[in-house]
Amino acid sequence: MRLEAKDIYAGYGKIEVLHGATLRAAEGEIICIIGPNGSGKSTLLKTVFGLLKPTKGTVSFDGKDITRLEPEQKVRLGIAFIPQGRNVFPSLTVRENLEMGGTVLDDEKAVQHAIEEALESYPLLKRKIRDKAGNLSGGEKQILSLARADMVKPSLILMDEPSIGLSPRMIDEVYLKIAEINRRGTTFAIVEQNARKALSMAHRGYVLDLGRTRLEDTGAGLLDNEEVKKLYLGG
């Protein structure tokens, strides 16, 4: 199993948000995590990445216990995290943002090679290579966040609300890129309020509620689930 989070309890100070949440993702899978606001979805991703330390439970990656590792250690293992909110450096150019994504590469030559590969894969960014990231649209910033995370070809990408605030056209573009990267074998764990979009391409999905994993099924299975339809798919 590429990623497995078991019986996770975590939160912020004395406020516990997760109460035994569990998820798993096999190599090459796209999994999505849906649920109401405040259910602990983002907290779960932050705990997997190491931004929060669980009070109970374990996180394993390719069979290795990584529960207590720091985020920078997890990056070197091949895990990338794209938080909610267009995680770019607004005062830096598109190229400079991509360079920041290559900091774990061995040398400058490797970084520049990765940038050239990224620009071939993301033509939208190639056209704006000298623009400040802060001047990009919301969708362009999300594409830049994804391209920067993809610079080191991680084996697992964690994404928090990739479609929030985007136009339907840009949502489609972001998810097309996710599908393209996934075809290389990269695993994705995606927290998403746009449940229909995420479940339609997910191999498996999870419903989180009140800090617990309430449902697990294939993406198609959750799309057909009457309770999920009523609560998260508009009927």
Tell me the role of every PLM-derived stretch:
Residues 13, 69, 94-113, 121-123, ...:
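ABC-type ATPase nucleotide-binding domains, specifically the catalytic core motifs of the NBD
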Residues 34-36:
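The feature captures the beta-strand-to-loop junction immediately N-terminal to the Walker
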Residues 49:
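Helix-to-loop junction immediately C-terminal to a conserved catalytic motif
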Residues 57-64, 77, 110-115, 217:
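Conserved ABC transporter NBD signature motif
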Residues 132-136:
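Conserved ABC ATPase signature
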Residues 149-150:
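ABC ATPase C-loop
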Residues 157-161:
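Catalytic Walker B motif of ABC-type/P-loop ATPase nucleotide-binding domains
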